[in-house]
Amino acid sequence: MKFNKLFASLVAVSLSIINIHVSAKTILLVPQDNRPVSLAYTVSTAEKAGYTVLTPPEQYLSTNHHQGLPELIWSWIDNNIEKADAAVISTDTLIYGGLVDSRKHTDSIDKLMYREKRIQQLHEKFPQKPIYAFGTIMRTPYASNTGVEPYYYTKYGPTIYHIAVLQDKLDKVGLTPNEEKQLTQLKASIPTEYLQDWFNRREKNNAITQNLIKYTKDNIFTYFCLGLDDSTVYSQSAMEARYLKNDFKNLSENKLGAFPGADQLALLLIARYHVDDNQLSPTFNIIYPLGRGEDTIPSYESQPVGKTIAQHITAVGGTININTPDIVLAANTPLFTTKESGQFANFKMSKPSTKEFVASIK
């Protein structure tokens, strides 16, 4: 996703510009899968900032083609945690196996809670080691034929998506008579067992997330970040996030953040550890090109990009200061709307609007 790269750039810049001498600190990192954005890019950025990064063997991690191995990853943690000064962990990996596994698993709630309990036990055994954790609210995609959703999503994904949109709208503002009729027809058009499977998995995942929020309240996590993976204004993901906010409404934003994104979260938490450990208070100013700027709502997200950037700055331990910032973040938002990554408008080329924006930065 284009804007996930933007936020990854934000935290990478945070590490590089506010970097002071790092005295060979070691971070134990459990990524959400083995993709470069989750593993290689994150490790490389942290190492360039002076950190040693420990990661599980790649064959233990989730991919698009096979499940992650949480039991083996937990054994690896047990054998390596004493070498680390801090831990940055994907709860999706430790509980479900990985990001994709969180959408497809068939594990019982008892098994999931057993794995989740091990996080608490890790903190109890090593209370002096800060744990920075990140998880996701399961996404609600319009369609998927890449094997990263349950098998029935290839055929029924758009139907499930529209059911979720209408149910969220019903819960939030209500439906018109025509929309109520449409919702009934959509539910009747899909085998009941598929809907039950999808919603039952979400119910289990939601219960796990509620416990993770409790762990944050109990100071098991130094900081917990909850990402909304590929969401829209109306969706099952947006509705779950709305209700989960009641569970953490009394928590400081310096303890828990919830906002769109998934791929950038590990790097964000490494930057947060860097800020905490060095007792820094970085300040930012954000500038935008012509167009909707901060009011742009990216595809697959449920809120304006300006709000999301501000939440990322808070999550990394920074504040906005337009007068004397440590960092000026230039967010290259589109003139109108965001495009799909494969569309011609997103090909790498020198565009007049981009040239003008870069010139204004200089």
Label the model's feature ranges.
Residues 15-16:
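Sec-dependent N-terminal signal peptides of Gram-positive bacterial secreted proteins and lipoproteins
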